[in-house]
Amino acid sequence: MPKCSRPPADGGYAYPAINVTSSQTLNAALKGFADAESDGIIQISVGGAAYVSGIGVNDRVTGSLALAAFAHEVAAKYPNITIALHTDHCAKQYLDEWVRPLLAHEADQVARGQEPTFQSHMWDGSTVPLKENLDIAEELLDKVAEGAHRARNRNRRGRR
């Protein structure tokens, strides 16, 4: 996971989180971070992910991974900033076609010794009953924790 270069509390500010929907909006966000000398969070929304996958394609996983790959490549040209990638506000109807497949993809990355593509995913359970919201949150958290546990164990083995 990227380590931000300076804690926001040191400067009395918070990390900005910018939703991007294309290479153009991503470039604008990165330039803004660089100009402000601020690390930041790049957020990909459900609509942005569908759009980036191709006109009429609407494959949110493809769009998310494509925009994330572009973000990693271009952000590397701004050595004074660190970005984190985040999927933003995933409602229940998009879990099976967006966040769950991304979590599976990232579990495969971690199993191969790679860092996950995204640093966070936001489950938005605001439209479902509280019990269902908490059950889904627990399931998603378990998947993320399992991947983090594998990564931690891999790192420990690598240090011996």
Locate the predicted segments by residue.
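N-terminal amphipathic alpha-helix/helix-capping segment at the start of soluble metabolic enzymes
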Residues: 1-16
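Divalent metal-dependent hydrolysis catalytic cores, especially in the metallo-beta-lactamase
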Residues: 15-18, 43, 118-121
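N-terminal low-complexity or amphipathic/hydrophobic leaders
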Residues: 20-54
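Short helix-capping segments at alpha-helix termini
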Residues: 35-36, 76-80, 145-148
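Active-site beta->alpha loop and helix N-cap motifs at the rims of alpha/beta catalytic domains
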Residues: 46-137
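Conserved anion-binding
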Residues: 126-160
